[in-house]
């Protein structure tokens, strides 16, 4: 929204105690929910697509040649990786061997992202873009499951990428 100059409000939502108004707006009951005039979007990717389509979007420009790769990486991220990430996140720490198994399954994806970042600062180039925006929240969820492990892991490129994005003006705002 910042990239296209749309004013917005962010509300912290407890998923255990969802506000009635949120459910009225989006019966699906998941976050995020974006409301603009008569438009309601309740999928992150739909919100991102809407933002990139705005005339005054001065931030995220997508090279048409990158679309196939973007779609492929997002499909893997939102499918296979997200499923493994949920297993990793929601497995009790008491089940250490199972938690480690799920983390290692996530690492197959994480390693690919880290290797991709050997060549440039961001996923498609040296400039933050659409793909970074789409994938970053999931990578952040992954490392927040066990921050100590992530800090000690050998994914230097990924750690630098996370730090660059986390410290950027866009993220801080």
Where are these regions (language model features)?
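GST-like fold's C-terminal all-alpha helical module
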Residues: 73, 77-167
